[in-house]
Amino acid sequence: PILKNLGEFAEIIKVSGDIDCGLANDGDADRIALFDGDGNYIDSHHILLLLIHYLHKVKGWNGKVGTGFSSTVKINQLCEKYGLELDVVKIGFKHLCGIMISEDVLVGGEESGGIAVKGHIPERDGIWNGLVIWEFMAKSGKSLRELIQEVYNVVGEFAFERNDLRISQSLKEEIVANCQAGKYDHFGKYKVIRIDDMDGWKYWLSDHEWV
């Protein structure tokens, strides 16, 4: 459920004038995306932050947070603010599922929109997560945008964009070889300040920006 596949849905919400939140799932409903009442797309990073904020700060639940390598650093910041232990794992929900089965986990989720929460099954469930967010909206009496602002008040605003590129196998191999050799030290005018290579490569351009 990514934005480029949901243009018609976003437009329906935007023109309706009486929809507070839109919920989008993939075919087997294990992934989630949301839209606010103005038809603005809410990505998985914001949803993860909302769930952590609601379950811990509002409901008073505790537990470890697990997230994938490609998730926003804002999760690290929110967990630090709330005193929650954070595990960052390789990409793929199987790495989170193992933690959720063996440990006390509040929220486990990754950038692709697969999220699991405490009190439910240790597996992705997009519909359930949507219901939890709707519960948050109903009990608080606030809009989705207002709830996101609550999170921003703690960790600051941020933006995320994902672009999936179709490239030739030869170019892919060349890029991987360059990454392995450490050949990328800047992207355009942005200098790389550090590199994480837990699963692929994450090039940090500042403490809060990465490629």
Model-derived segments and their meaning:
Residues 26-27, 41-46, 121-125:
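Short glycine/threonine-rich catalytic loop with a Thr-x-Gly-x-Asp
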Residues 21, 58-211:
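Phosphate-binding and adjacent anionic-ligand microenvironments
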Residues 30-50, 75-76:
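Short Gly/Thr/Asp-enriched flexible loops that form oxyanion-binding sites at enzyme active sites
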Residues 1-35:
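N-terminal small/polar loop signature for handling phosphorylated ligands or for N-terminal nucleophile
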Residues 27, 37-38, 47, 70, ...:
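Short, ordered loop/turn segments at secondary-structure junctions
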